[in-house]
């Protein structure tokens, strides 16, 4: 197993320091080659925060009693006193990077970059940029050059910003796909309004739950599918008068 890590002031202890908004206390990487597995279990968690980035292979986490598989690009965040249990397997050549951090405004900082209090795992993106940023933080902790603590905060914030942009991009794509799907549904209902249309059947035929279809149709079109069909029928009847 390849490992490279560094610690603030060479301390292996959990650091809790609220004197500054955000403080990086340690950073490192693991890459499994021949070792069969690498398991971490902290029943009472740690006193600080931790963010784990899966760069290659897979990582297996237990989060809120559920087993979760993290693929490349996934980020997992642990908060103070949160139970930690995760495992990496050598035959999957897993590569992960991790960073521990503390500070007086950590919650606000995470929220600012789209990581709300109930979020434990999210997709940050499978980008080489993250490897570079993690390695820069490791190097800063190892070399301790002038103003390195400020540089650590700067690099970590850059990482959080990149992850936030990825989430915003993913949300935008999801909304765009949903809007196109609802436009197609509206076009179909508009063309076949005079036929016997069962909303539930349409949703099932297009692999959508009925509640999801109705909710997103209303959000995109401004009315429910049934109301939309009725409005078309009423408009047609008025034209025939």
Predicted regions and their residues:
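Short helix-to-turn junction characteristic of helix-turn-helix DNA-binding domains
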Residues: 54, 189-192, 241
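Generic protein-terminus/edge-of-domain signal
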Residues: 1-69, 90, 107, 113-120
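Short acidic-glycine-tyrosine-enriched beta hairpin
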Residues: 65-79
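Basic/polar phosphate-binding segments, predominantly the helix-turn-helix DNA-binding elements
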Residues: 162, 184, 190-235
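Amphipathic alpha-helical segments enriched in hydrophobic/aromatic residues interleaved with Lys/Arg
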Residues: 108-174, 187
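Ligand-binding loop in jelly-roll beta-barrel domains
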Residues: 67, 81-105
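Short, structured helix-loop boundary elements
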Residues: 21, 48, 127, 131, ...
């Amino acid at each position: 197993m390849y490992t490279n890590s560094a610690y603030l002031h060479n301390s292996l202890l959990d650091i809790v320091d609220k004197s500054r908004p955000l403080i990086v206390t340690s950073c490192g990487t693991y890459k499994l080659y021949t070792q069969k597995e690498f398991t971490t279990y902290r029943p009472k968690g740690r006193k600080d925060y931790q963010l784990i980035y899966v760069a290659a292979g897979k990582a297996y986490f237990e989060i809120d009693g559920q087993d979760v598989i993290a693929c490349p690009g996934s980020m997992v965040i642990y908060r103070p006193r949160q139970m930690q249990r995760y495992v990496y397997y050598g035959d999957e050549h897993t590569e992960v990077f991790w960073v521990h951090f503390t500070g007086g405004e950590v919650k606000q900082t995470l929220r600012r970059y789209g990581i709300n209090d109930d979020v434990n795992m999210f997709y940050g993106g499978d980008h080489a940029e993250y490897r570079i940023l993690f390695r820069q933080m490791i190097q800063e902790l190892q070399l301790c050059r002038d103003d390195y603590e400020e540089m650590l905060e700067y690099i970590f914030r850059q990482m959080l910003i990149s992850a936030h942009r990825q989430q915003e991009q993913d949300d935008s794509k999801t909304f765009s796909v949903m809007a196109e799907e609802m436009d197609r549904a509206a076009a179909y209902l508009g063309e076949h309004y005079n036929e016997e249309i069962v909303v539930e059947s349409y949703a099932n035929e297009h692999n959508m739950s009925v509640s999801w279809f109705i909710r997103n149709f209303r959000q995109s079109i401004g009315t429910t599918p049934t109301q939309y069909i009725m409005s078309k029928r009423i408009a047609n009847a008025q034209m025939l008068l």
